[in-house]
């Protein structure tokens, strides 16, 4: 697949959210995860969006951005290209999402669609939260 974005499950893109899959200089796209930068050797590459990510209206997602599961992005400008898991990103900075608030929102979201947020998935995210808090 030549020009791809990778989107997880239960993602909510606010109206007008956009993503670029080509740099203005036609250079190869680099992707950053945590403190590590990867050379993709690709000219066309969109973004990587984890499960349960939410963006606000009009979010502009840059080429090669990585948004971790459970993150929420609210920004009038281009957000960071690397937003860690379970993180709220606003124009004033980043903060960790409280796990109980995240779990409650997952239950609400899935209930709207007649689906359960089951104990296995809940425990997965609780364990993930503990891992990233260390």
Q: Can you name each region flagged by the protein language model?
A:
Residues 1-133:
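Glycine-rich hexapeptide-repeat left-handed beta-helix
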């Amino acid at each position: 697949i030549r020009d791809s974005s990778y989107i997880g499950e239960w993602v909510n893109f606010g109206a007008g959210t956009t993503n670029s899959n080509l740099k203005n200089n036609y250079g190869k796209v680099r992707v950053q995860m945590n403190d590590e930068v990867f050379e993709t050797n690709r000219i066309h590459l969109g973004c990587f969006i984890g499960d349960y990510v939410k963006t606000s209206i009009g979010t502009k997602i840059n080429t090669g951005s990585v948004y971790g599961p459970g993150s929420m992005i609210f920004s009038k400008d281009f957000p960071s290209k690397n937003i860690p898991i379970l993180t709220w990103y606003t124009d004033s900075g980043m903060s960790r999402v409280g796990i109980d608030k995240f779990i409650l929102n997952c239950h609400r979201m899935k209930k709207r669609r007649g689906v359960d947020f089951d104990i296995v998935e809940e425990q997965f995210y609780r364990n993930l939260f503990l891992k990233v808090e260390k």
